[in-house]
């Protein structure tokens, strides 16, 4: 998360979370189009790190990195802690615009088991979304595994209606008001990236996720990832919100394992706002000693030019 904090109160923030694989130091998503209220004096940033072998670094120290905030190098941190990944709120979005195959149905059952049993994420922190005709729908929340929810996914196509972006907005709004306010929140999207009927645009879906502090991880259900507009949309959704894009072919459980591994080595750092200059503050995290360390986060935060 990158968020200016007022001295006496913490305002809503948006997350900057890191994921593994093929990244360079400080890679981030698109510029958020939001402002904060005035009198903010502190920035909080959530991130993760990997080593040269693409493994999460669980022993990171505050001296191992520096933050570059709008060209100001920050090494004097107010706080530095490991994130509590057991509070993770996970939502899964299933693109049901086409028939959900028996294989995918089985994979969803495995995913629910992985999240609840193997990863130790409480059942109440898990929800499942899908399309119901042209409308977003919540299949379950808090009892997905007990209700065998994966078996109740629609077995027939939604007649070409694909409200993907609307469903992302719907799920992000749900997560924003659900669970621990300080919990990291992630929406895992299983889709081909196509949208045929949403009122919301791709940009509005990204904005909704950022405003709700939800990051998107997208598992591409296309047969081939390259040259597809849907794949490009999924890459945009993931990249702009600090998540990760998983190209085909790939297994659902395998992708979730990678996502969960990332949260086990995530951190939160806070520092005094280095500049009250209005506008976009680009943020990067760079290694100070081990140049093989790599960090990934969103691009920064937007500071207001007037009192809101």
Q: What does each of the following model-derived ranges do?
A:
Residues 1-13:
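Bacterial N-terminal signal peptides that target proteins for export
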Residues 2, 15-18, 200:
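Residue-level recognition of conserved structural "scaffold" positions that shape functional pockets
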Residues 10-22:
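Bacterial N-terminal signal peptides
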Residues 26-308:
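Scaffold/interface architecture of coatomer-like assemblies
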């Amino acid at each position: 998360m990158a968020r200016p904090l007022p001295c006496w109160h913490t305002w809503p923030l948006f997350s900057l979370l890191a994921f593994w694989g093929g990244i360079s130091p400080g890679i981030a998503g698109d510029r958020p189009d939001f402002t904060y209220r005035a009198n903010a004096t502190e920035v909080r940033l959530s991130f993760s790190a990997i080593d040269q072998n693409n493994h999460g670094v669980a022993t990171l120290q505050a001296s191992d990195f520096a933050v570059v905030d709008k060209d100001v190098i920050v090494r004097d941190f107010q706080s530095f802690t490991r994130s509590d990944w057991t509070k993770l709120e996970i939502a899964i979005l299933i693109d049901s615009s086409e028939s959900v195959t028996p294989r995918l149905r089985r994979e969803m059952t495995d995913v629910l088991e992985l999240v609840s049993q193997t990863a130790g994420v409480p059942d109440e922190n898990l929800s499942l979304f899908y399309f119901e005709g042209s409308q977003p729908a919540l299949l379950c929340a808090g009892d997905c595994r007990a209700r065998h929810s994966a078996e109740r996914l629609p077995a027939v196509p939604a007649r070409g209606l694909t409200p993907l972006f609307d469903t992302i907005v719907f799920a992000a709004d749900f997560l924003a008001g659900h669970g621990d306010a300080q919990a990291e929140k992630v929406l895992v999207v299983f889709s081909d990236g196509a949208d045929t009927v949403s009122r919301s645009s791709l940009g509005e879906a990204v904005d909704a996720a950022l405003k709700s502090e939800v990051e998107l991880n997208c598992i591409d259900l296309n047969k081939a990832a390259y040259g597809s507009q849907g794949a490009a949309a999924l890459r945009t959704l993931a990249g702009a919100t600090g998540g990760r894009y998983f190209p085909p072919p790939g297994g659902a459980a395998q992708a979730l394992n990678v996502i969960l591994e990332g949260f086990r080595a995530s951190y939160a750092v806070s520092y005094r706002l280095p500049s009250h200059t209005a506008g976009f503050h680009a943020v990067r995290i760079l290694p100070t000693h081990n140049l093989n360390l790599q960090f990934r986060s969103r691009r920064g935060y937007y500071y207001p030019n007037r009192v809101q």
